[in-house]
């Protein structure tokens, strides 16, 4: 269920195939004007005018993503200039979310605009991991980290789990969701 409400391009396998990490979508909508990106060469901006949207009750959006085409554009070091080609080129840290305006923590140039001018608001990453023969759910992971911190708090989802290669992912496309095999 949790994977169904995650951003397709945020699903990735980490920690030597023992963790499946993802970023849950808590809201989304359309932005009104194109955002600055590597193609339009507009100046970096820290605000985005958006259509009315509501956030899922009980959640707290941490990030906004626009035009993501792979997990490498969603995770990694914060990067506010996609022209450099490294880091989270399609993710920005959200400072505030008003009904018609998203404010970022810093001005940003995005990797690309979304084809339909869509944005998604995301929670901090979560991960399912196989640790000590348990399937565990870790919340509040660091989007800048290359791996899941399995030393933190977790919820046990199942006991006596033994598999040699627990997770595999077939990346999503514009017209097909990500496929995860357990």
Where in this protein do the model-derived segments appear?
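N-terminal alpha-helical signal peptides/signal-anchor transmembrane segments
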Residues: 1-11
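Cell-surface, membrane-associated systems
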Residues: 15-21, 26-182
């Amino acid at each position: 269920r949790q994977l169904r409400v995650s951003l397709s391009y945020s699903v990735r396998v980490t920690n030597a195939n023992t963790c499946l990490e993802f970023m849950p979508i808590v809201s989304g909508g359309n932005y009104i004007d194109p955002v600055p990106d590597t193609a339009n060469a507009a100046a970096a901006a820290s605000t985005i005018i958006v259509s009315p949207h509501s956030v899922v009750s009980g959640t707290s959006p941490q990030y906004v993503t626009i035009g993501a085409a792979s997990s490498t554009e969603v995770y990694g070091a914060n990067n506010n200039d996609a022209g450099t080609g490294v880091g989270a080129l399609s993710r920005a840290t959200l400072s505030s979310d008003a009904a018609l305006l998203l404010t970022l923590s810093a001005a940003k140039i995005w990797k690309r605009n979304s084809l339909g001018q869509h944005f998604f608001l995301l929670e901090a990453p979560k991960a399912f991991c196989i640790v000590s023969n348990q399937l565990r759910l870790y919340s509040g992971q660091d989007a800048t980290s290359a791996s899941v911190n399995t030393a933190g708090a977790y919820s046990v989802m199942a006991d006596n789990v033994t598999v040699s290669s627990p997770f595999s992912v077939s990346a999503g496309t514009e017209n097909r969701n990500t496929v995860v095999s357990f």
